[in-house]
Swiss-Prot record:
Similarity remark: Belongs to the SmpB family.
Organism: Neorickettsia sennetsu (strain ATCC VR-367 / Miyayama) (Ehrlichia sennetsu)
Gene name for this UniProt entry: smpB
Matching Pfam families: SmpB
Designated name of the protein: SsrA-binding protein
Region (Disordered) residue spans: 124-147
């Protein structure tokens, strides 16, 4: 598994409930640009549209050798999931306060580009502060164990 892009802020801003994997519908120039490890998930989000999952605002920069036949960098891209998973996800998203957040894009062992996304609930500011305190405390304990 070769990771192309990671959404680092997702784990900090949201508490993740359940993770899913999906295929993604891409154009040829997008595939080539992604294979060069150039993508950004910082502003990306997953949304439902007509009983389908769509990945919005993922930035894939233009593939330089393609010149005028390039893609639109932030276009919406369809995610491919099984119908059973789609029903489970749609039921969960209807719950107040839950959203779908993309976590990473990677190439699996078969050479297919996949998106890992999660069902998540937004954290409040005090939750984020508590996470930072817990992380610092764990680091301090790990240092003391080595001493």
């Amino acid at each position: 598994m070769k990771v192309i892009a990671i959404n680092k802020k997702a784990r900090f801003d949201y508490s993740l409930i359940d993770e899913f994997e999906a295929g993604i519908v891409l154009l040829g120039t997008e595939v080539k640009a992604l294979k060069y490890h150039s993508a950004s998930l910082n502003e990306a989000f997953v949304a439902f549209r007509r009983f389908e999952l769509w990945l919005n605002n993922m930035h894939v920069p233009p593939y330089k050798p393609a010149s005028r036949f390039n893609h639109v960098p932030t276009r919406s891209r369809k995610l491919l999931v099984h119908k059973r998973q789609l029903n489970k996800i749609s039921g969960a998203v209807r719950t107040k306060g839950l959203t779908l957040v993309p976590l990473s894009i990677y190439v699996n062992e078969n050479g297919l580009i996949k998106v890992k996304f999660a069902l998540a609930k937004g954290k409040k500011k005090h939750d984020k502060r508590q996470d930072i305190k817990d992380r610092d405390w764990a680091r301090k304990q790990a240092r003391q164990d080595f001493s």
